[in-house]
């Protein structure tokens, strides 16, 4: 049974005498740092030299240091820089400056789980992963609410890693909503699978296939765009708010009949078998190896496939149609 923690389970006092060094000031970095500061904790920011985020962080009231110096000053080091650069930054700026008894925090388990970062045995390692983008983490905190989060402990040198993680989660507002216990393995593998098979890879490929099917059958690309991409937001919003039940309650009976009878023919057992292969490719580390090598080679496949989609008919039509929708912020 899932184990969930709330406000009463976390003691913010565990962090009151500590300095939290937040590395990175992007989507999660700015939100987590500001929430921690507003919770009465001492927070500093670590950024690479000449970072464009430096002025923003200073304007938000933080002392900003180069990454290595922030690590030296910190007791809790929260690593919120992109996955693909974490390993290099860890080896260069973090590992040489860690002290015994420090805690390393993450919001995604990729580099720990796949062995790209191997912390020394004399530090705690935990993960607190808010299940929303940074702007929502911040907004909910300011409204006196919070977003759900995940908690995992990879290494418990102090005997208090779980408690420190919960204290951190409370500081950013997650315990207001609930924090679910997990592992670095579970968070990493399910997160990657969701991105590849459903949220990003599965969704974009479904959109492209549907759009191309209609256009190849002679329908206007603009109409195909509305039916296969634009209206997706209406359905996703309903799913987000109330699951399958609310979505099906809100659409027409004709749409629901097509949903429940035709949908399984599109996403059939063959697709599910492919999904199992995708999951296995994540579990055995092959995807991680591919992504690491892709970055070392300056992303030739990443850049080529992205450019291809950016120049597609789907994107050209979408750009024109979105100009007709003043409610959409570009």
UniProtKB/Swiss-Prot annotation:
GO terms for cellular component: cytosol. Residues 183-328 form the KARI C-terminal knotted domain. The keyword Magnesium applies. GO terms for molecular function: ketol-acid reductoisomerase activity; magnesium ion binding; NADP binding. GO terms for biological process: isoleucine biosynthetic process; L-valine biosynthetic process. Mg(2+) 2 binds at residues 191, 227, 231. Its EC number is 1.1.1.86. Residues 2-182 form the KARI N-terminal Rossmann domain. Keywords: Amino-acid biosynthesis, Branched-chain amino acid biosynthesis, Magnesium, Metal-binding, NADP, Oxidoreductase. The active site is at residue 108. Signal peptide: none annotated. Its cofactor is Mg(2+). The keyword Chloroplast does not apply. Pathway: Amino-acid biosynthesis; L-isoleucine biosynthesis; L-isoleucine from 2-oxobutanoate: step 2/4; Amino-acid biosynthesis; L-valine biosynthesis; L-valine from pyruvate: step 2/4. Mg(2+) 1 binds at residues 191, 195. It catalyses: (2R)-2,3-dihydroxy-3-methylbutanoate + NADP(+) = (2S)-2-acetolactate + NADPH + H(+); (2R,3R)-2,3-dihydroxy-3-methylpentanoate + NADP(+) = (S)-2-ethyl-2-hydroxy-3-oxobutanoate + NADPH + H(+). NADP(+) binds at residues 25-28, 48, 51, 53, 83-86, 134. PANTHER family: KETOL-ACID REDUCTOISOMERASE, MITOCHONDRIAL. Belongs to the ketol-acid reductoisomerase family. Involved in the biosynthesis of branched-chain amino acids (BCAA). Catalyzes an alkyl-migration followed by a ketol-acid reduction of (S)-2-acetolactate (S2AL) to yield (R)-2,3-dihydroxy-isovalerate. In the isomerase reaction, S2AL is rearranged via a Mg-dependent methyl migration to produce 3-hydroxy-3-methyl-2-ketobutyrate (HMKB). In the reductase reaction, this 2-ketoacid undergoes a metal-dependent reduction by NADPH to yield (R)-2,3-dihydroxy-isovalerate. This is Ketol-acid reductoisomerase (NADP(+)). It comes from Petrotoga mobilis (strain DSM 10674 / SJ95).
């Amino acid at each position: 049974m899932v184990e969930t923690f709330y406000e009463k389970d976390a003691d913010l006092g565990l962090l009151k005498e500590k300095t939290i060094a937040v590395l990175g000031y992007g989507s999660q970095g700015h939100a987590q740092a500001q929430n921690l500061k507003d919770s009465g904790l001492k927070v500093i920011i670590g950024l690479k030299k000449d970072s464009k985020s430096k002025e923003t962080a200073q304007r938000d009231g933080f002392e900003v240091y180069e990454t290595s110096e922030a690590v030296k000053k910190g007791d809790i080091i929260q690593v919120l820089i992109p996955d693909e650069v974490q390993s290099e930054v860890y080896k260069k700026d973090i590992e040489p400056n860690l002290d015994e008894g420090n805690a390393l925090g993450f919001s995604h388990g990729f580099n720990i789980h796949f062995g790209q970062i191997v912390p020394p045995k004399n530090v705690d390692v935990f993960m607190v992963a808010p299940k929303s983008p940074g702007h929502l983490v911040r907004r909910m905190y300011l409204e006196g609410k919070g977003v759900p989060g995940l908690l995992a402990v990879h290494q418990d040198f102090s005997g208090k890693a779980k408690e420190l993680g919960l204290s951190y989660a409370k500081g950013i507002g997650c315990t207001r909503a609930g924090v679910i216990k997990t592992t670095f393995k579970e968070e990493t593998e399910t997160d990657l699978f969701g991105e590849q098979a459903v949220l990003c890879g599965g969704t974009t490929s479904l959109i492209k296939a549907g759009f191309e099917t209609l256009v190849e059958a002679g329908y206007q690309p603009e109409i195909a765009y509305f039916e296969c991409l634009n209206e997706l937001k209406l359905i996703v919003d309903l799913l987000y708010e109330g699951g399958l039940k609310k979505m099906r309650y809100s659409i027409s009976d004709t749409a629901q009949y097509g949903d429940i009878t035709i949908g399984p023919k599109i996403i059939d057992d063959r697709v599910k078998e492919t999904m199992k292969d995708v999951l296995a490719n994540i579990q055995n580390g092959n995807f991680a190896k591919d992504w690491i090598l892709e970055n070392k080679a300056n992303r030739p496949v990443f850049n080529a496939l992205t450019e291809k989609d950016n120049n597609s008919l789907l994107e050209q039509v979408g750009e024109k149609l979105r100009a007709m929708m003043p409610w959409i912020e570009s």
